[in-house]
Curated annotation (Swiss-Prot):
CDD domains, sorted: Dtyr_deacylase (cd00563)
Entry function: An aminoacyl-tRNA editing enzyme that deacylates mischarged D-aminoacyl-tRNAs. Also deacylates mischarged glycyl-tRNA(Ala), protecting cells against glycine mischarging by AlaRS. Acts via tRNA-based rather than protein-based catalysis; rejects L-amino acids rather than detecting D-amino acids in the active site. By recycling D-aminoacyl-tRNA to D-amino acids and free tRNA molecules, this enzyme counteracts the toxicity associated with the formation of D-aminoacyl-tRNA entities in vivo and helps enforce protein L-homochirality.
Name of the protein described by the UniProt record: D-aminoacyl-tRNA deacylase
Main location: cytoplasm
Chain ranges for the short sequence motif Gly-cisPro motif, important for rejection of L-amino acids as given in the UniProt record: 137-138
Superkingdom, natural source: Bacteria
GO BP: D-amino acid catabolic process
Record's keyword terms, sorted: Cytoplasm, Hydrolase, RNA-binding, tRNA-binding
Subunit (UniProt): Homodimer.
Protein location: Cytoplasm
Gene Ontology molecular function, alphabetical: D-tyrosyl-tRNA(Tyr) deacylase activity; Gly-tRNA(Ala) deacylase activity; Ser(Gly)-tRNA(Ala) hydrolase activity; tRNA binding
Species whose genome carries this gene: Pseudomonas fluorescens (strain ATCC BAA-477 / NRRL B-23932 / Pf-5)
Class of enzymatic activity (EC top level): hydrolase
GO CC annotation: cytoplasm
Length: 145
């Protein structure tokens, strides 16, 4: 499972012009599920997302986690993040999980995040989404389980 984490001052996701998820200060995470992923993979990614220290402390060092700053977490499914881009000029998506598994594990990740962290929003799995964000830094990390 991959999570492309971006520290944001604010972010929202829209489907057909309607806002379906939004956060203020926090993290926007684009999530890709791969064929070998399990609920344990989702649990591991979520632990990292909530505890990865990407926010500045009083001394300006990246020493605080999302949980520490009580920031928002916006989860957006993005199967293209799992693409194989090693050869040719067209991405292959054979390295992405089948849609049923992707949806099951993405939904599981969202529910677990809501149980463990107060401020969680998400996009809509499989929808054509428009994501708006104000990057903070920018600070971006690719997390993999």
């Amino acid at each position: 499972m991959k999570g492309l984490l971006q520290r944001v001052r604010g972010a929202r996701v829209e489907v057909a012009g309607d806002i379906v998820g939004a956060v203020d200060q926090g993290l926007l995470v684009l999530v890709a599920v791969e064929p070998e992923d399990t609920r344990a993979s989702a649990d591991k990614l979520l632990h990292k997302l909530l505890n990865y220290r990407v926010f500045s402390d009083a001394e300006g060092k990246m020493n605080l986690s999302l949980a520490d700053v009580q920031g928002g977490l916006l989860l957006v499914s993005q199967f293209t993040l799992a693409a194989d881009t090693k050869s040719g000029l067209r991405p292959s998506f054979s390295t992405a999980a089948p849609p049923a598994l992707g949806e099951e594990l993405f939904d599981y990740l969202v529910v677990k995040a809501q149980q463990l962290h107060g401020k969680v929003a998400s996009g809509r799995f499989g929808a054509d989404m428009q994501v708006h964000l104000v990057n903070d830094g920018p600070v971006t990390f690719l997390l993999q389980t």
